[in-house]
UniProtKB/Swiss-Prot annotation:
Catalytic activity: L-glutaminyl-[protein] + H2O = L-glutamyl-[protein] + NH4(+)
Name the UniProt record assigns to this protein: Probable chemoreceptor glutamine deamidase CheD
Keyword 4Fe-4S set for record: no
Family per record: Belongs to the CheD family.
General function of this protein: Probably deamidates glutamine residues to glutamate on methyl-accepting chemotaxis receptors (MCPs), playing an important role in chemotaxis.
The EC number(s) this enzyme carries: 3.5.1.44
Length: 226
């Protein structure tokens, strides 16, 4: 399975509230720590984040997916927006980092009905049902969950010791943050696509301009009239 390199979260920052380095997880991204004492944070509306870790090694990670599953026959299903692919990627990256599959445990969050369009399609509820069903099938125990409801959530996950702090948010606040996060993601992808598709430009040294110098003509004075 090949994973797009830009699916790995890359927004590192220092959180002055928690006094530690952190990584922001945007929609369709994931991040895996290798025992570092990092904080992973995200904002969830109808999306779901699965926080997985190996408690023995402290290796852990988080994903952030938007939809439960896609058409298995479609190439678009193999993207991080779909839960099935996002879970597979997260588990595989944890194992590559040194986690043991039989020690993995999970905490899952999100799936809120925060937008009217999402409520009609039950996207949040379907996301929550999917992640619980997936983890049960994979024999990964769920140690904590906060799914559903009409609230959005801000998640702070500490993979090293397994702590998760959840803050419920007013729907209009969450909507604004998700819009910003989505715009950031689109902007980053557009910039990357532009850099890949930009035509090759050969650069040459600028030619030296030839400047001819002439003697400045003498100014005529009133006394020099003929």
């Amino acid at each position: 399975m090949s994973v797009r390199l830009d699916a790995r979260a890359s927004r590192h920052y220092y959180d002055s509230t928690f006094e530690r380095h952190a990584v922001k997880i945007l929609p369709n991204e994931y991040f895996v720590t290798k025992g570092e004492d990092l904080m992973l944070s995200t904002v969830l509306g109808s999306c779901v984040a699965a926080c997985l870790r190996d408690p023995l090694t402290g290796i852990g990670g988080m994903n952030h997916f938007m939809l439960p599953d896609g058409d298995a026959q479609s190439p678009a299903s193999a993207t991080m927006r779909y839960g099935a692919f996002a879970m597979e990627v997260l588990i595989n990256e944890l194992l590559k980092a040194g986690a043991a599959r039989d020690r993995l445990e999970a905490k899952v969050f999100g799936g809120g009905a925060v937008l009217s369009a999402m409520q009609q399609m039950n996207i949040g509820e379907r996301n929550g049902q999917f992640v619980l069903s997936y983890l049960k099938t994979e024999n990964i125990p769920v140690r904590a969950q906060d799914l559903g409801d009409t609230h959005a959530r801000r998640i702070h996950y500490f993979p090293f010791d397994g702590r998760v702090l959840v803050r419920k948010m007013a729907p209009h606040h969450a909507k604004a943050e998700e819009v910003i996060a989505h715009r950031e993601k689109l902007a980053a992808q557009k910039a990357q696509d532009n850099s890949r598709s930009a035509p090759r430009i050969e650069r040459f040294d600028a030619p030296k301009m030839k400047v001819e110098m002439f003697k400045r003509p003498l100014r005529r004075t009133a006394n020099a009239e003929s």
